[in-house]
Amino acid sequence: HAFCTGKYLREVILPRLNKGLENSGRRREDFEISGGGFVVTGADDEAVSKMFEWVRMRVGFYGSTPSYWPVFEQHGWEDLGFKLNDLSKKGQWEQMTNEVSDDIVNEFCAVGRFDQITDKIRRRFAGSVDVIAMPENTPSDLLEEIRQIGRSL
């Protein structure tokens, strides 16, 4: 799921996954991990900024749901989940988005223009996931470049 930070992935999900694989006698190579956050990218800074704001809204929306609060808890953001949940019950959707800081949004995504995103993806996802979802407007040559690094993620 995209509602996942690098810290939550490394400190909670991967250890649990590795224990499950060990208990079942399966190898990590036989299992594919998809996701682990959002990829925020575009041709220029304006496009990146627009997508960043969309992710802010998604984090506010998902974060209002108690099922997703363990991610917040891993960062010490428990109060944010309660606040977002309260705002959702009041139908204050815009205020929910406003409660999510830039720093929090950045924990959930790799951010950069098309000419920067490969490095950002490598830093964010290396050693953690096998497959990531890219925005639909990503140029095909960039997708191929990311596919190549994906083999070494």
Predicted regions and their residues:
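Active-site-adjacent structural elements that line small-molecule/cofactor binding pockets in enzymes
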Residues: 1-153
